[in-house]
From Swiss-Prot:
Pathway the protein acts in: Mycotoxin biosynthesis
Knockout consequences: Abolishes the formation of phomopsin A and leads to the accumulation of phomopsin B, a dehalogenated derivative of phomopsin A.
Name listed for the protein in its UniProt record: Tyrosinase-like protein phomQ1
Residue intervals passing through the bilayer: 53-73
Enzyme Commission designation: 1.14.18.-
Binding site for Cu cation A: 141, 150
Signal peptide: none
GO molecular function terms attached to this record: metal ion binding; monooxygenase activity
Binding, Cu cation B: 290, 316
Organism annotation: Diaporthe leptostromiformis
InterPro entries membership: Di-copper_centre_dom_sf, Tyrosinase/Hemocyanin, Tyrosinase_Cu-bd
Length: 389
């Protein structure tokens, strides 16, 4: 440690050692000697003052830098975003894919349904994604992380298709605004080039208004996990059952069907995209267009075990696309903008829920390493590298 006292003592000791043969007492007491010492000490004192000034300025500067970093890290933007990729993959709408590309995707999904689970014996890798979605439900729904969490979830699912099943293309999406006049007639339900259609109208109800799907590539497929209930309960139980759907049609409830069609119409989605900030956008989106699809399909799709239905991933890819479009309207202000409760405020009703932050770590339910929200805000930065056509 630097010591002013030891520095001055060393300087004087050297001077006295050089006074051999001289009356030291008289010399040290003389005005000439005193003046000489003061003059010789002046540069050293100036140096000391300069060092003190440098130290003080450095401390203040460092404190200011730390203060700015803390402020920015708790805000909605970041000054050092990850480097963007130069050749992003392009996610395309389902009906724009060639029949060959559609078949490759369906085949990869079927592959996941035959690979063994890493969590529970007797279930599949596909089932693990259903369980993980439910396990993290209170963090990934009606919360600030709703959109970022599902973006990461889709990335992990897409990576599983590639790593385990040889899929080489991008995850497709279903733009349901194109079918808002007649959801049940969408080509997504085609038994040959799609995912099969409604549940068997003459069959027994399996769960939540749904019946076994009996056509298409997933006809009579067995799913391992079922939700304990609709609504706020995120829990699932092991309960093998057939993939189930129960479309709302005119004969069921014409008024409800018209309302659901309206929620996914181009004009209604345009209103959502016009929302000025993140919390207004995600709240309007989640409770409006996003929820309309599960309420139309019903069955597995109506609960937190919704990923039992392979169409779920195309639905949420479209949700991600619309968020991406909203971000692209003002990248500087929106790419890293997040706001809302840290957890599902419905599930924690009556309890104080903290504000979500871009620094929050999102639990991924064992599907991947837990990750900070800020890592998935930009689809062309970091490990993400995609955009939408």
């Amino acid at each position: 440690m630097f010591s002013l006292r030891s520095w001055r003592y060393t300087a004087l000791a050297g001077d006295e050692d050089d006074l051999e043969g001289i009356d030291k007492k008289a010399f040290l007491a003389s005005p000439l000697r005193s003046s000489s010492l003061r003059q010789r000490n002046q540069p050293k004192q100036l140096l000391l003052l300069l060092l003190r000034t440098i130290i003080v300025v450095s401390v203040i500067t460092f404190a200011a830098i730390i203060g700015c970093w803390v402020f920015l890290s708790h805000g909605t933007t970041t000054t050092n975003p990850p480097q963007q990729c130069s050749t992003p993959a392009v996610r395309k709408e389902w009906r724009s894919l060639s029949p060959s590309a559609q078949a490759k995707y369906i085949s990869a999904v079927q592959c996941l349904m035959y690979l063994p689970s890493v969590h529970k014996e007797g279930t599949t890798l596909y089932d693990d994604f259903v369980f993980g979605h439910s396990k993290t439900g209170s963090y990934s729904h009606y919360a600030a992380s709703f959109l970022p969490w599902h973006r990461m979830y889709l990335h992990v699912y897409e990576r599983a298709l590639r790593d385990h099943c040889g899929y080489s293309e991008s995850l497709p999406y279903w733009d349901w605004t194109l079918d808002s006049h007649h959801l049940s007639a969408s080509p997504i339900w085609d038994p040959v080039t799609g995912f099969g259609g409604d549940g068997n109208p003459g069959g027994a109800e399996t769960l939540h208004g749904g019946r076994c799907v009996v056509d298409g590539p997933f006809a009579n497929s067995t799913r391992a996990w079922r939700a304990l209930s609709e609504g706020h309960n995120h829990d699932v139980e092991y309960g093998p059952h057939c993939l189930s759907r129960g479309f709302i049609i005119n004969n069921d409830d014409r008024t409800t069907l018209e309302m659901l069609h309206g929620l996914v119409s181009p004009s209604r989605v345009a209103q959502t995209l016009d929302k000025p900030d993140y919390i207004a956008f995600f709240e309007d989106f989640e409770s409006g267009p996003h929820n309309a699809i599960p309420q139309f399909i019903r069955g597995d799709f109506l609960t937190f075990s919704a990923p039992n239905d392979p169409v779920f991933y195309l639905h949420h890819a479209n949700v991600d696309r619309l968020w991406w479009l909203w971000q692209q309207r003002d990248p500087a202000g929106r790419l890293y903008q997040v706001r809302g409760p840290a957890k599902d405020f419905r599930y924690h009703e009556g309890h104080e829920v903290s504000e979500g932050s871009i620094e929050d770590v999102m639990p991924m339910g064992g599907l991947a390493e837990d990750i900070k929200m800020k890592s998935v805000m930009d689809t062309r930065a970091g490990f993400l590298c995609y955009e939408y056509e």
